[in-house]
UniProtKB/Swiss-Prot annotation:
Residues 1-55 form a transit peptide. GO terms for cellular component: mitochondrion. The gene is Mrrf. This is Ribosome-recycling factor, mitochondrial. Keywords: Mitochondrion, Protein biosynthesis, Transit peptide. InterPro entries: Ribosome_recyc_fac, Ribosome_recyc_fac_dom, RRF_sf. It is found in: Mitochondrion. The keyword Mitochondrion applies. One of its GO terms (biological process) is translation.
Length: 262
């Protein structure tokens, strides 16, 4: 009995430095036993196993990079008093629809008279569609005519609008008559249209960034009356919506590129 008491007194000092280990139940403390002899008696001393913290290696951290982030789904009705995610979604969708409309009206292999209808002309009275101030017709398979006799004062503005329409057109003027030669369907022409499609897609992405920035700025105004966790969650939702829209824009560009290159 006496020898048993003596053996527990001979605890290693390191044991006393682990206060956290002492506060846990004995069943949770990992003990290490060391045997030895003192005064002719075999004695055993108990030492707590030193806790080891395993840090992530650089290789493990690198492996985690590039992994898809967990998606969030915010109940739009619950945050309506903070920001209307429905309106943000509609604004982002309008960017996509504008690009699709641009692709359909201006980027076609063969230019038809209808392609010129909605070209916007800047006049002294404001912006108007070309078909509202000029009579558009097909003179031949190679030439489109725009008769500006009804609004001769807008002829110069119409020529400028056609040239800057992004359709790779080079109009020629004869008095109030604008001749628009239709580009030949060459490989160079196709590649030019693809280049314009990329430019229009980049403009759409710029408009999308403006929508995202406006939404984030609106959200910041609610930081004083909304918890940080809620703000961060909504920010993540908005960023996620923007990323999804970018992916959709890229899909439309890929489809248009395939169509144009044949």
């Amino acid at each position: 009995m006496a020898s048993g008491i003596r053996c527990f007194r001979l605890l290693h000092p390191a044991f006393r430095s682990y206060h956290a280990a002492l506060t846990r139940p004995v069943s949770e403390v990992s003990m290490k036993t060391v045997s030895g002899r003192q005064h002719g008696h075999r004695q055993y001393s108990a030492y707590p196993a030193v806790p080891v913290r395993h840090f992530a290696t650089k290789k493990a951290k690198a492996k985690g990079k590039g992994q898809p982030q967990a998606r969030v789904t915010v109940n739009r009705a619950l945050v309506e008093d903070i920001i209307s995610l429905e309106e943000v979604d509609e604004d982002m969708k309008s960017v996509v629809e504008a690009l699709k409309d641009n692709f359909n009206k201006t980027l076609n292999i063969r230019t038809a008279p209808g392609s010129l209808d909605h070209i916007t002309v800047v006049t002294a009275d404001g912006k108007v569609a070309l078909n509202q101030i000029g009579q558009i017709s097909m003179k031949s398979p190679q030439v489109i005519l725009v008769n500006m006799a009804s609004f001769p004062e807008c002829t110069a503005a119409a020529i400028k609008a056609i040239r800057e329409s992004g359709m790779n057109l080079n109009p020629e003027v004869e008095g109030t008559l604008i001749r628009v030669p239709i580009p030949k369907v060459t490989r160079e022409h196709r590649e030019m249209l693809v280049k314009l499609a990329k430019q229009n897609t980049n403009k759409a992405k710029e408009n999308l960034r403006k929508v995202r920035t406006n939404a984030m700025n609106k959200l910041k105004k609610s930081k004083d009356k909304t918890s940080e966790d809620t703000i961060r969650l909504i920010e993540k939702q908005i960023s996620q919506m923007a990323d999804d829209t970018v992916a959709e824009l890229d899909q439309h560009l890929a489809a248009k590129t395939k169509e144009l290159l044949g």
